Amino acid sequence: MDLGKVITAMVTPIHPEKDKVCKKRIHHLVNHLIANGSDGLVVAGTTGESPTLSHDEKIKLFRQVIETNAGRAKLIAGTGSNNTAETIAFTKEVAELGGIDAVLVVAPYYNKPNQDGLYAHFVAVAEASDLPVVIYNIPGRSVVNIEPETIIRLAKLPNIVGVKESSGNLDNISKIIAETPEDFLVYSGDDSLTLPILAVGGDGVISVASHVVGKEMQEMIQAFARGEVQKAASIHRSLLPIMNGLFAVPNPAPTKYLLNQQGISVGPVRLPLVDLNAEQGTKLQAILEGLSK
């Protein structure tokens, strides 16, 4: 399955006065991302502030992204939760919308399941889903790490097509790549590890930085694919400051700040997250401006 190389984990545009998901801003953002290097979009993921979106808001968001996208980019819907039955029901509902290519299912958080529980959770979701499933391993948020052996077992299921790996452990990621089928997709969940993961056989990145440096991310990946390793490495090094800067305070506040500054209105973050203060914004803007020097 081809979901692309640069997949943007899209922020959710919120109307600043009404505190509602905003159709006009979604339309503008989706077009911006597709025009600037995104092969695909993850909708209602971590960067999309999924914990503070209601069920109805997520459905509205999916519908509006599907409408604007019109089949141009691959669409991956975030449907995971720490409730297996709820994840299954929501995934089925999303499949009925049409226009979604896959679902991203996060490791159950807070409950702290063991590896057997994690395996059973993903098997249950995959067997009930009409859409391909991408596993999302993010132990920094979910507390539990999906061990390589568990992902390797899950990769044998026909409906589990890939993993977004945000563990930051290259040894584990290398093991997953080595011991899963050739067509099992392994995406970096960390912008700064995109090139290292490509180097050990990964497929691309589910990116935050691509909101503002999407063309550069795409250029880096394409250079590596052509065998221009030094060029790819040079681009990687040049992008590291902004990749790190976008996580200097909790995501997605920095990304929303830069988009708003660039005239791509996406509104504020929702509590309990807070927007950047003036000093933080000035520092981040300086990092971005430094890329062109």
UniProtKB/Swiss-Prot annotation:
It is found in: Cytoplasm. Pyruvate binds at residues 47, 206. GO terms for biological process: diaminopimelate biosynthetic process; lysine biosynthetic process via diaminopimelate. The active site is at residues 136, 164. The record marks 46, 110 as: Part of a proton relay during catalysis. GO terms for molecular function: 4-hydroxy-tetrahydrodipicolinate synthase activity. It catalyses: L-aspartate 4-semialdehyde + pyruvate = (2S,4S)-4-hydroxy-2,3,4,5-tetrahydrodipicolinate + H2O + H(+). Pfam families: DHDPS. It comes from the Bacteria. The keyword Amino-acid biosynthesis applies. GO terms for cellular component: cytosol. InterPro entries: Aldolase_TIM, DapA, DapA-like, Schiff_base-form_aldolases_AS, Schiff_base-form_aldolases_CS. Its main location: cytoplasm. Catalyzes the condensation of (S)-aspartate-beta-semialdehyde [(S)-ASA] and pyruvate to 4-hydroxy-tetrahydrodipicolinate (HTPA). Belongs to the DapA family. This is 4-hydroxy-tetrahydrodipicolinate synthase. It comes from Listeria welshimeri serovar 6b (strain ATCC 35897 / DSM 20650 / CCUG 15529 / CIP 8149 / NCTC 11857 / SLCC 5334 / V8). The lineage of its organism: Bacteria, Bacillati, Bacillota, Bacilli, Bacillales.
